[in-house]
């Protein structure tokens, strides 16, 4: 189990699993997949996930113009409209905002953080060659560098501190996990909260055998969760995460598939399945109020 300061109330709470729903992601085409885009769609999908046990909603902002919903938006008003819709639909919910951008210009995510003041903000903690192949061996998209140098991370962390957002460090490989510890030792952040992103083709695979190694190299006692990208092969890693005391995340940003290999109908069905995995590990699902206390 994740370690917390000793107290009777926390010893009870730490047994519980906090569930995060990754509502929509950054580029998936809503015409092809059940990805919510508009405030109404996002609210309905968040409500389904909330009712199934999700206390945290991880949100990407999409362009609202017709036929452009597959593209990201950093308009603060779009962010505010989506945030308000989620909070209205899910009383007490915790918002986790994306901040990921390619290149040095972070003005968009910063403007959105300052506008909506999320409780948690994702902080991409290191650089990755972001690659994927088609079945014929050609690139699925032009090879790109998801660049997150230290100065970019520091700029994000400064605004998270200003807006009282808790940083969630996105870690795509073991070196990035170790970098997060260096950020804390350097004083760039006070508490490390890890999100092990597994299943990106050029990052860590979704493999249960990696989890003990990742836990070995993170800061002792830190909160951690896994983000698992893929199809039915990710679900054993969800189960192992639950058994090892990690917090759990799923949603149509990460997968469209249930453990059976069937396609999901949406976020509610995925979170319902994830909640059962927590219970299989002997852990109850944390309520939003309990999640706030644990965090």
Regions found by a protein language model. Give the residues of each.
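N-terminal small/glycine-rich loop or linker at the start of catalytic domains
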Residues: 7-34, 127-139
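Alpha-helix-loop-beta-strand connector modules within alpha/beta enzyme cores
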Residues: 21, 68-97, 153-160, 213-221, ...
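Conserved, mostly hydrophobic/aromatic
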Residues: 42, 49, 60, 121, ...
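Glycine-rich, proline-tolerant flexible connector loops at the mouths of alpha/beta enzymes
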Residues: 55-80, 198, 256-260
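Flexible, glycine/charged-enriched surface loops at secondary-structure junctions
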Residues: 56, 169-170, 281-290
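Catalytic alpha/beta core domains of metabolic enzymes, predominantly
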Residues: 120-253, 264
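C-terminal helical cap(s) of enzyme catalytic domains, especially alpha/beta-barrels
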Residues: 133-140, 144, 260-283
